[in-house]
Structures are given as structure tokens and as C-alpha cells.
A protein has these predicted regions:
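Conserved, ordered domain cores of eukaryotic regulatory proteins
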Residues: 1-62
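Catalytic core of Fe(II)/2-oxoglutarate
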Residues: 59-60, 69-174
Length: 174
């Protein structure tokens, strides 16, 4: 996320930094991580039906990591229904996707195979709380259009390629 959506990364991270500063009892699952929540799906044959994660930040990114032992050519594909594609999703791979706005699922795997997932995400409510001045919506006098400004959070290809030196791989970026 830091590499492909650095502005969104900083916004997410600063929101959690502020939350931690205001409440010392709040701790992240992983230090300096920009996503607030983590779900471990232990399987042994984790699959999902087509869904959108409607409580996540609509213009945020969700991280999904696939684990286990299965043949990614035969099953465990990530299906992005709105795009009309199924993507091979091998074990120990991670993808970032806007899970609140893209209908997604994954395909089943073989009877003798295993598949688990780790999903990381942030609730839209955390960002609304920040936009409302750290007060409930009914109490705040802040503008209620905070969710309308996501366009500047995403990187353009030319911005990303400017950060890459000749011969450097994208995966080597900070």
C-alpha cells in the first residue's frame, strides 16, 4: 500500500496515529500498520461467496493474503465479478483491493487441499469519526462530505514510475 497508494497509506496511518494518541488503550495489531483490523480465517478450506465489504472505507484498500497448500491452477482463484475476471491467487500471495466497492469471492479448492486467509481492512467509521472532529455525527459541526474526496488518494501511473530508477524493480520501492 505504501508503494502503490502512498497518499492513502499516509492518510490511513495518520488516522490510526491520531486514534492511538487520543486513547492509549488502543493498539494496532502490527506496529505502524495502516489498516485497523485483521481477520484470520483458519479454514481448513476457506472460501467466500460473492460479497462487498460495505462497512469498509469505500475508497480504501483491503489486504488479502492466501495461505495453505493447494494448486492455484485448479482452484482458490480470486473472482472479481464487476470486472468479469478470475485471477490465480497462489498460496502466500497478497493482493490489495477496494473490497467495499468490488464484488469479490474465491473459488473452492480440492478435497485434500487447505486454504486459509488473513484479511486486513479499516472500517469507514474510523475515518468518519476523524472527519467529524472526533465526535459522533450528531454532535459534530464538521462538514459531512468527507467521503467525497477520494480521488487524490490514489496514485497515477506516471507518479509511480517517476519513483522507479532505471533497472530498479517496483518491489524494491519503500
Amino acid at each position: 500500500m505504501c508503494t502503490f497508494a502512498p497518499t492513502l497509506f499516509k492518510f490511513s496511518q495518520s488516522t490510526l496515529d491520531l486514534l492511538e494518541a487520543m486513547n492509549p488503550d488502543v493498539r494496532r495489531h502490527f506496529p505502524d500498520h495502516p489498516l485497523a483490523s485483521t481477520t484470520f480465517n483458519f479454514g481448513p478450506r476457506t472460501i467466500t461467496f460473492p460479497h462487498k465489504d460495505l462497512k469498509n472505507l469505500s475508497w480504501g484498500l483491503c489486504s488479502v493474503t492466501s495461505l495453505g497448500s493447494y494448486d492455484p491452477k485448479k482452484g482458490g482463484h480470486l473472482v472479481l465479478w464487476d470486472l468479469g475476471i478470475a485471477v490465480e491467487f497462489p498460496p502466500y500471495s497478497t493482493i490489495l483491493l477496494p473490497s467495499a466497492i468490488i464484488l469479490h469471492s474465491n473459488t473452492s479448492i480440492g478435497e485434500d487441499e487447505t486454504r486459509m486467509t488473513i484479511t486486513q481492512y479499516s472500517s469507514a467509521g474510523l475515518f468518519a469519526w476523524r472527519a467529524y472532529g472526533y465526535m459522533p455525527k450528531g454532535v459534530s459541526t464538521q462538514a459531512t462530505t468527507w467521503w467525497k474526496h477520494p480521488k487524490h488518494m490514489f496514485s497515477r501511473v506516471w507518479e509511480l514510475t517517476q519513483r522507479v530508477q532505471p533497472g530498479q524493480r517496483m518491489s524494491a520501492l519503500p
